[in-house]
Amino acid sequence: MFATFTDWSMDVPEEGVKTAEEMWPEIQAAGALSMRIVKIDDTGARSMTMWPDEETAHKAIHSMRAKGAAKSGGEIIGSAMGTVLAEFG
């Protein structure tokens, strides 16, 4: 399993959730298994998307991020990705 994290800056982070919800079918069709979005401050959110493997993530992530930024009016201010080492709960 592989995870991608994207840090977003936007006026109202809750509005970004609406964009993500609209885009979820397309993201899922690209191979995503799940996505979580966390509000990290008044103008920021972090998304975590789980993928079956690194190759699937890399094929999809750049276009999905660009579409998300264009639709939400948000700006990507950081990102990270890597192989999932463990999952609990």
What are these regions (language model features)?
Residues 1-48, 52-66, 72-89:
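Short S/T/G/P-rich N-terminal loop/turn motif that feeds into the first structured element of a domain
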